[in-house]
């Protein structure tokens, strides 16, 4: 079963409660926590290759875009949308390159995920299973009851 392509989320568009402790500085580009109720979708680690397992991009922003498109495709198969994502863990092979590329990564994010920012962590790793991969992202989504 193939689902229609999901549209990016609008600002503040989430069926879940964003958790922000009183007095904490507002995070930029992520949430400190999310509360959700419904059917859970677990998206295994996605990397920046296309549906034929071919890398079309060899730079981090390009691979992030493809990785996020892959996540949206998996979500769509479960009738989930970007705004249903409650948490993501990013694994990057070069945190300095990640920091240098934030502007381009932000554009890739908005093109695929919109203005929905779930709870997230970014972890630098020494390598990923696929030698060409520069990023791998796991996601969890909750589709409301």
How should each PLM-predicted stretch be described?
Residues 1-86, 92-145:
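N-terminal presequence-like segments and the immediate start of the first folded domain
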